[in-house]
Amino acid sequence: MASTSVAAAEVKAQTTQAEEPVKVVRHQEVGHKSLLQSDALYQYILETSVYPREPEPMKELPRVTAKHPWNLMTTSADEGQFLGLLLKLINAKNTMEIGVYTGYSLLSTALALPDDGKILAMDINRENYDIGLPIIEKAGVAHKIDFREGPALPVLDELLKNEDMHGSFDFVFVDRDKDNYLNYHKRLIDLVKVGGLIAYDNTLWNGSVVAPPDAPLRKYVRYYRDFVMELNKALAVDPRIEISQIPVLDGVTLCRRVY
């Protein structure tokens, strides 16, 4: 979701034998370029372990999203696979997603949850969500989704007023406005249950977190970099959570609430 690393277009993969013809393979058409140093290694992961197991609705949604001018904001196939498996491992049932875009990560979550599972999904743009909604409906999982259009902070504040909502969420995925990540964390830590997970996307922010101050960065990358770095520092010392920062795509930090 709201994620702005460089989109990987369809490219020609070189074969190991120089005399063999160049073969066109499927690359991550939309989404983020991997932080792996080798594009060939990333492509190997996709072709070997991700695409063969990707459900048909999740193959279709990127094709539809590719027509959108901001298609690079979508979650990638390998991250979607990672999230789906993670949800099953923790037996998640009640989840939340902040930042939906066209719904790739949302669809991955919905497919992973049991039939009576629920997702509170929030995004400021309903039009983007409507692009993927027909595919979500066709997949038979739309009934699991409670979509709210608008800023997430007022919704979170309203939830916090209800004591019954404290500790009620098994899993939260955050992939929206990076300048509000810390504001989200201050609220989500009370809404997720002890033992539950919060996943923050883009915590390596296109690798810019290690770029020198005078590095030539895109304007939006430079603007949000400081907010991402501030979040990373805060999560690293928060005693209420255990964390693991994983270099999946643009970086995902998992936070497990311990008290």
Swiss-Prot record:
<feature type="binding site">
    <location>
        <position position="75"/>
    </location>
    <ligand>
        <name>S-adenosyl-L-methionine</name>
    </ligand>
</feature>
<dbReference type="InterPro" id="IPR050362">
    <property type="entry name" value="Cation-dep_OMT"/>
</dbReference>
<comment type="similarity">
    <text>Belongs to the class I-like SAM-binding methyltransferase superfamily. Cation-dependent O-methyltransferase family. CCoAMT subfamily.</text>
</comment>
<feature type="binding site">
    <location>
        <position position="105"/>
    </location>
    <ligand>
        <name>S-adenosyl-L-methionine</name>
    </ligand>
</feature>
<keyword id="KW-0949">S-adenosyl-L-methionine</keyword>
<comment type="function">
    <text>Methylates caffeoyl-CoA to feruloyl-CoA and 5-hydroxyferuloyl-CoA to sinapoyl-CoA. Plays a role in the synthesis of feruloylated polysaccharides. Involved in the reinforcement of the plant cell wall. Also involved in the responding to wounding or pathogen challenge by the increased formation of cell wall-bound ferulic acid polymers.</text>
</comment>
<keyword id="KW-0808">Transferase</keyword>
<feature type="binding site">
    <location>
        <position position="201"/>
    </location>
    <ligand>
        <name>a divalent metal cation</name>
    </ligand>
</feature>
<feature type="binding site">
    <location>
        <position position="206"/>
    </location>
    <ligand>
        <name>substrate</name>
    </ligand>
</feature>
<keyword id="KW-0489">Methyltransferase</keyword>
<feature type="binding site">
    <location>
        <position position="202"/>
    </location>
    <ligand>
        <name>a divalent metal cation</name>
    </ligand>
</feature>
<feature type="binding site">
    <location>
        <position position="123"/>
    </location>
    <ligand>
        <name>S-adenosyl-L-methionine</name>
    </ligand>
</feature>
<feature type="binding site">
    <location>
        <position position="97"/>
    </location>
    <ligand>
        <name>S-adenosyl-L-methionine</name>
    </ligand>
</feature>
<keyword id="KW-0479">Metal-binding</keyword>
<dbReference type="GO" id="GO:0046872">
    <property type="term" value="F:metal ion binding"/>
</dbReference>
<comment type="pathway">
    <text>Aromatic compound metabolism; phenylpropanoid biosynthesis.</text>
</comment>
<feature type="binding site">
    <location>
        <begin position="99"/>
        <end position="100"/>
    </location>
    <ligand>
        <name>S-adenosyl-L-methionine</name>
    </ligand>
</feature>
<dbReference type="GO" id="GO:0042409">
    <property type="term" value="F:caffeoyl-CoA O-methyltransferase activity"/>
</dbReference>
<dbReference type="GO" id="GO:0032259">
    <property type="term" value="P:methylation"/>
</dbReference>
<feature type="binding site">
    <location>
        <position position="177"/>
    </location>
    <ligand>
        <name>S-adenosyl-L-methionine</name>
    </ligand>
</feature>
<dbReference type="GO" id="GO:0009809">
    <property type="term" value="P:lignin biosynthetic process"/>
</dbReference>
<feature type="binding site">
    <location>
        <position position="175"/>
    </location>
    <ligand>
        <name>substrate</name>
    </ligand>
</feature>
<dbReference type="Pfam" id="PF01596">
    <property type="entry name" value="Methyltransf_3"/>
</dbReference>
<dbReference type="InterPro" id="IPR029063">
    <property type="entry name" value="SAM-dependent_MTases_sf"/>
</dbReference>
<dbReference type="InterPro" id="IPR002935">
    <property type="entry name" value="SAM_O-MeTrfase"/>
</dbReference>
<feature type="binding site">
    <location>
        <position position="33"/>
    </location>
    <ligand>
        <name>substrate</name>
    </ligand>
</feature>
<feature type="binding site">
    <location>
        <position position="175"/>
    </location>
    <ligand>
        <name>a divalent metal cation</name>
    </ligand>
</feature>
<keyword id="KW-0438">Lignin biosynthesis</keyword>
<protein>
    <recommendedName>
        <fullName>Caffeoyl-CoA O-methyltransferase</fullName>
        <ecNumber>2.1.1.104</ecNumber>
    </recommendedName>
</protein>
<feature type="binding site">
    <location>
        <position position="152"/>
    </location>
    <ligand>
        <name>S-adenosyl-L-methionine</name>
    </ligand>
</feature>
